[in-house]
Amino acid sequence: MADLDAAWTRLEAAAKAAGDKRIVEFFDAEPGRLDALTLDVAGLHLDLSKQAWDEAGLEAALDLAHAADVEGARARMFDGEAINSSEGRAVLHTALRAPAGADVKALGQPVMAEVDAVRQRMKAFAQAVRSGAIKGATGKPFKAILHIGIGGSDLGPRLLWDALRPVKPSIDLRFVANVDGAEFALTTADMDPEETLVMVVSKTFTTQETMANAGAARAWLVAALGEQGANQHLAAISTALDKTAAFGVPDDRVFGFWDWVGGRYSLWSSVSLSVAVAAGWDAFQGFLDGGAAMDEHFRTAPLEQNAPVLVALAQIFNRNGLDRRARSVVPYSHRLRRLAAFLQQLEMESNGKSVGPDGQPAKRGTATVVFGDEGTNVQHAYFQCMHQGTDITPMELIGVAKSDEGPAGMHEKLLSNLLAQAEAFMVGRTTDDVVAELTAKGVSDAEIATLAPQRTFAGNRPSTLVLLDRLTPQTFGALIALYEHKTFVEGVIWGINSFDQWGVELGKVMANRILPELESGASGQHDPSTAGLIQRLKR
């Protein structure tokens, strides 16, 4: 513990020293900076040279990782130990993308035979639906899938579909998550029940939002196909076979997963069966392979050359060394536009904790607030604040080096904006440059005195740039695994359990208490504000 405390002190001192300097000057002071802070891994190119650390800051961050025993924690995770201590569970989403026959154990018990058996069932089902061997009740092949889930049962598969979907898919995949009935109505308005397969994703088959939408979907099917016909249009991803049977799902269309797979890590599992069907098994297998490639890198690479470790350390340097409490993730890729929403759950649900496994308060700040959207759209939205606002927000900018999609010339324009923003965030624009430009335009000295400060960019905004060689199932899998392992490393260093989520429970309990009051007029005990709102809604 003393070594860890000392490492934190060194990091904070190094960050303070680096924070008084300009990032662009580090390149002159450190001739090897670009080589030291760029990596090529599994089809991804990472450039961390525009981050706010200098050589001493990077060294202090790596010392902190060693002091926190990141290597030991990494080994314990891959060995299947119960690193989710509050629930006594192993954490083995990595097993879902491991090759058949790999030696993977959860709490000492081999798991790959079961994992591969489920994968083979998924593959057979996906191929049968795509080929038309599995049909609907009226003999028509399925041309659409309605995927119903929420949280990890929605965000991951939805992002995965955006990344993998063909331009003109043979099967239309749509998603419903929210308990707001408008989403269900708008999503299903032009769908044909005779040609739609409904896939319900809920491990316990009790999730309120999911089961409300599942009930609506079943009623929609029954109205068109009758009770028995509706059953032929159902599949489920769940471990509650009694509940799926009662709902009408045939047993051979229920696909399970394991308690060592957390919801926000479950897109590698049968949770994404809908995508495997709609995009094709080869695409889904490529996604698994890309994740496995990043796993191998993370498991074996030394910390100073380890992509997930370095991305995590950059965030810790910003969060804890420089007190940057938010981070913006901007993919310059329409297919990756939902990445920030996915990372909000992955990172903020994993590391949004203020208490460690020992029940003691965390000694330092933990998860940052993650936000973002696709570039170049965000340049016309919140980038004004990013460039000239009073707070500095570190960024991750993500691009795709080569793309054959869309009209000629557009991808180069997209990439030019990506590179320009990364450079502008770092170098900024000096007042002298602005004054010279305005003077050349004949602007008066009085106007220059007021305009120049407004047009000055301080720069010195740190960013990491990630380039995918191409957006393929493999590189997308590597990207998601990169962020998963980054999140794990941060949790280890912060001394928290990244794999439970007690913070989501309280609201569920209270919603279940309030629902009868809205439905039947029952009364309950609430604070004055909540009680007043309930009375207003009862009118």
Curated annotation (Swiss-Prot):
It comes from Caulobacter vibrioides (strain NA1000 / CB15N) (Caulobacter crescentus). It is an enzyme of class 5 (isomerase). It catalyses: alpha-D-glucose 6-phosphate = beta-D-fructose 6-phosphate. GO terms for molecular function: carbohydrate derivative binding; glucose-6-phosphate isomerase activity; monosaccharide binding. Belongs to the GPI family. Its EC number is 5.3.1.9. This is Glucose-6-phosphate isomerase. Residues 519-539 are annotated as: Disordered. SUPFAM superfamilies: SIS domain (SSF53697). The keyword Cytoplasm applies. Keywords: Cytoplasm, Gluconeogenesis, Glycolysis, Isomerase. PROSITE patterns: P_GLUCOSE_ISOMERASE_1 (PS00765), P_GLUCOSE_ISOMERASE_2 (PS00174), P_GLUCOSE_ISOMERASE_3 (PS51463). It holds the Pfam family PGI. The active site is at 349 (proton donor), 380, 508. Pathway: Carbohydrate biosynthesis; gluconeogenesis; Carbohydrate degradation; glycolysis; D-glyceraldehyde 3-phosphate and glycerone phosphate from D-glucose: step 2/4. It is found in: Cytoplasm. Catalyzes the reversible isomerization of glucose-6-phosphate to fructose-6-phosphate.
